[in-house]
């Protein structure tokens, strides 16, 4: 079976004094339909790894392939298509636009990706998240768990 994601001898270094190399020859294969978790102590490269895996950071050496596309050589258009239809991000801190309702936060995700905003699709996602009755609420009126679900829904749209 073809890997969903493959990293081969990935090196990522930051030059800030002193130089830091959080990824040094990392190789791994993620098969389709596999869930992974990245754990470890603070400052050891977890976020760097995820950013490299998603094509947000380019490594100094090595190769990162998503469905055979080399993310280290991908054009901006290729990366945009992958981010729209393949790789989504949910950050540890739920980043929501505080002046926008739950519905508007999801709507903005579709507009930012260039997709036609489909009201039914947004309400369907809100229903799946158990937030359909909170569609017109601002993030300040949502619980921490509801905010996290809203951020997850945004990544899934």
Each language-model region and where it sits:
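Short coil-to-helix segment of the ABC ATPase nucleotide-binding domain corresponding to the Q-loop/switch region
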Residues: 100-108
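ABC-type ATPase nucleotide-binding domains, specifically the catalytic core motifs of the NBD
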Residues: 15-17, 107-119, 128
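Conserved ABC ATPase "signature" region
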Residues: 69-70, 117-134
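ABC ATPase NBD coupling module
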Residues: 20, 71-88
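The feature captures the beta-strand-to-loop junction immediately N-terminal to the Walker
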Residues: 39-41
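Conserved ABC ATPase signature
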Residues: 138-142, 146
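Helix-to-loop junction immediately C-terminal to a conserved catalytic motif
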Residues: 54
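Conserved ABC transporter NBD signature motif
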Residues: 62-70
């Amino acid at each position: 079976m073809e890997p969903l994601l493959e990293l081969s001898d990935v090196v990522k270094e930051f030059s800030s004094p002193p130089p830091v190399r959080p990824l040094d020859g990392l190789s791994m294969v993620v098969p389709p339909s596999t869930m992974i978790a990245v754990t470890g102590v603070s400052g050891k490269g977890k976020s760097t790894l995820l950013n490299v895996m998603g094509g947000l950071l380019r490594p100094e050496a090595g190769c990162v392939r998503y469905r055979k596309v080399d993310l280290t050589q991908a054009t901006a258009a290729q990366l945009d298509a992958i981010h729209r239809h393949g790789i989504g991000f949910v950050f540890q801190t739920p980043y929501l636009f505080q002046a926008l309702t739950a519905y508007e936060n999801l709507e903005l995700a579709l507009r930012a990706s260039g997709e036609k905003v489909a009201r039914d699709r947004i309400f369907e996602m809100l229903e799946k998240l158990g937030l359909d009755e909170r569609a017109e609420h601002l993030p300040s009126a949502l619980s921490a768990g509801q905010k996290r679900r809203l951020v997850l829904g945004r990544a899934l749209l």
